[in-house]
Amino acid sequence: MNLEILTPDKKIFSGDVYGVQLPGIGGIFEVLGKHAPIVSALKAGKLKILKDKNATSLYSIQGGFVEVMNNKATVLVEGVKES
């Protein structure tokens, strides 16, 4: 699955990943490859990139949205910093 994390100022991350864990309004959820299309609001919290089944990267995000379509997840956030 391809993942992009974008802020209004710049691209934070772009690359192929196993999946991503996101802080949704209703709770934490995970998106893996070939996920059904979805658009969801995100609240401030931790975003975890699952690079493979063992390696992860963690980011603190401010609110935003995620769109998943055609095996690509695009995360649009107000602000982000690597944890």
Language-model regions: role of each:
Residues 2-83:
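Compact, glycine-rich, soluble single-domain proteins
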